[in-house]
């Protein structure tokens, strides 16, 4: 049975890991950031954010564009789409 571990393994193989601590893994690929929440070595969800620059202030920010909390073929395809951009 496929689980969130499958999607996290996909991120580990295709995106650059930026941070890791006991309850969060972060990956970066192009303009997208992936935050993986874990609880006692069990993955609970993936948050996908997009990096943007404010028009006038030139500040860098992040906007959450998607969240994934279970493995499905549709979610697998969504992750792949973000990794290919």
Show which residues each predicted segment covers.
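Negatively charged, low-complexity tracts enriched in Asp/Glu with abundant Ser/Thr
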Residues: 1-28, 57-70
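Glycine-centered tight beta-turn/hairpin loop motif at sheet-sheet or coil-to-beta transitions
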Residues: 29-33
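Intrinsically disordered, low-complexity regulatory segments enriched in Ser/Thr/Pro
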Residues: 34-71, 77
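Short acidic DE-rich linear segments
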Residues: 80-85
């Amino acid at each position: 049975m496929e689980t969130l571990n499958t999607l996290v393994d996909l991120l580990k193989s295709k995106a650059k890991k930026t941070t890791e601590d006991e309850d969060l893994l972060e990956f970066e690929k192009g303009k997208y950031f992936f935050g993986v929440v874990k609880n006692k070595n069990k993955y609970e969800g993936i948050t996908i954010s997009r990096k943007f620059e404010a028009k006038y202030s030139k500040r860098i920010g992040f906007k959450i564009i998607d969240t994934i909390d279970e493995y499905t073929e549709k979610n697998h395809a969504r992750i792949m789409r973000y990794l290919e951009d």
